[in-house]
Amino acid sequence: MANIKSQQKRNKTNERARLRNKSVKSSLRTAVRAFREAAHAGDKEKAAELLVSTNRKLDKAASKGVIHKNQAANKKSALAQALNKL
């Protein structure tokens, strides 16, 4: 436990941010998994619809600093390629 008051406050802030980031990353994984399942099933319409929502979530996570912008770009590119293969 920190002795300095400002560090105690930072620890609280960091813990809140960690939990928030964990939640965002979990929802990202769920969105990507849903897209991949739709793509694997060959449902092009549903996959295209899920791609849009997944891309929005990836962009938002990148803009908030939860994931790196290049990671978001790489995931978006891979998902688009998967959709185009259908």
Swiss-Prot record:
<dbReference type="GO" id="GO:0003735">
    <property type="term" value="F:structural constituent of ribosome"/>
</dbReference>
<comment type="similarity">
    <text>Belongs to the bacterial ribosomal protein bS20 family.</text>
</comment>
<comment type="function">
    <text>Binds directly to 16S ribosomal RNA.</text>
</comment>
<dbReference type="GO" id="GO:0006412">
    <property type="term" value="P:translation"/>
</dbReference>
<keyword id="KW-0689">Ribosomal protein</keyword>
<dbReference type="Pfam" id="PF01649">
    <property type="entry name" value="Ribosomal_S20p"/>
</dbReference>
<dbReference type="InterPro" id="IPR036510">
    <property type="entry name" value="Ribosomal_bS20_sf"/>
</dbReference>
<feature type="region of interest" description="Disordered">
    <location>
        <begin position="1"/>
        <end position="25"/>
    </location>
</feature>
<dbReference type="GO" id="GO:0015935">
    <property type="term" value="C:small ribosomal subunit"/>
</dbReference>
<keyword id="KW-0694">RNA-binding</keyword>
<protein>
    <recommendedName>
        <fullName>Small ribosomal subunit protein bS20</fullName>
    </recommendedName>
</protein>
<dbReference type="GO" id="GO:0005829">
    <property type="term" value="C:cytosol"/>
</dbReference>
<keyword id="KW-0687">Ribonucleoprotein</keyword>
<keyword id="KW-0699">rRNA-binding</keyword>
<dbReference type="GO" id="GO:0070181">
    <property type="term" value="F:small ribosomal subunit rRNA binding"/>
</dbReference>
<dbReference type="InterPro" id="IPR002583">
    <property type="entry name" value="Ribosomal_bS20"/>
</dbReference>
